[in-house]
A protein has these predicted regions:
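Class I S-adenosyl-L-methionine-dependent methyltransferase catalytic core
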Residues: 1-216
Length: 216
């Protein structure tokens, strides 16, 4: 089973370098578990993955050390302050969150279409950027900070997108909400990545994604 929004390969060596001193890392919204490919770039710690949709992990074979299936806002399997680091890529609140079923044969790059059925309640993959999306990510980040050790490292890969010709400030939201929850923002790395070449805004794409780096 394919996932419509796996990590771009260009991020993996960057993550591996940032995480090199961490004994373990959690990806709470792991999708297929591709984060485990940081081991190919020198990371030697334990990789723990969690996702609300259990089927994603069946689509690829990555060297994940431990899998969990739960809402990232309620990871009751994890202890307080259990993880040295968290590295994740939340949904971007873009048109990949469209939740209708296409019957006209056109290509649809959405979580719903790739998974093949309705998403689990609480999955941000059906949330367009707005109040529901923002409230849910605040809950998720509160839970992430609960399971992250004091002075632990938090890495968030996220991007703005274009809607009706306007750039939506998704990156700024994630930066602000984590700061409001008590995380210390350290720096942002902007990385040019290939973007989708079709769709309503195919001629207007944000050309970079951001890696936001925080300490608890």
């Amino acid at each position: 089973m394919q996932h419509p929004a796996k990590y771009s390969n260009v991020f993996l060596p960057i993550f591996a370098d940032l995480l090199k001193d961490c004994g373990n890392v959690l990806d709470p919204m792991a999708g297929t578990g591709k984060i485990a490919k940081i081991k190919e770039f020198g990371y030697s710690g334990k990789v723990v993955c969690n996702d609300i949709e259990s089927e994603w992990k069946n689509g690829e074979e990555y060297a994940v050390d431990e899998w969990h299936n739960s809402d990232a806002a309620n990871m009751d399997w994890a202890n307080d302050c259990e993880f040295d680091s968290i590295c994740t890529s939340p949904t971007y609140g873009n048109r990949m969150a469209d939740n209708f079923v296409s019957k006209d044969g056109t290509r649809r790059i959405t979580y719903r279409h790739y998974l093949g059925h309705e998403l689990q309640e609480g999955n941000t993959g059906y949330m367009q950027f707005g109040k529901k999306y923002c409230d849910k990510h605040k809950e998720i980040y509160s839970e992430c900070l609960r399971v992250l050790k004091p002075n632990g490292l938090m890495i968030v890969n996220v991007s703005n997108h274009i809607r009706a010709g306007v750039e939506i400030p998704v990156v700024e939201f994630h930066k602000n909400v984590l700061t409001e929850l008590g995380a210390k923002f350290e720096r942002e790395i902007k990385v040019k990545t290939p973007r989708m070449g079709y769709g309503a805004n195919s001629k207007q794409r944000v050309d970079t994604e951001s890696i936001l780096i925080f300490k608890k």
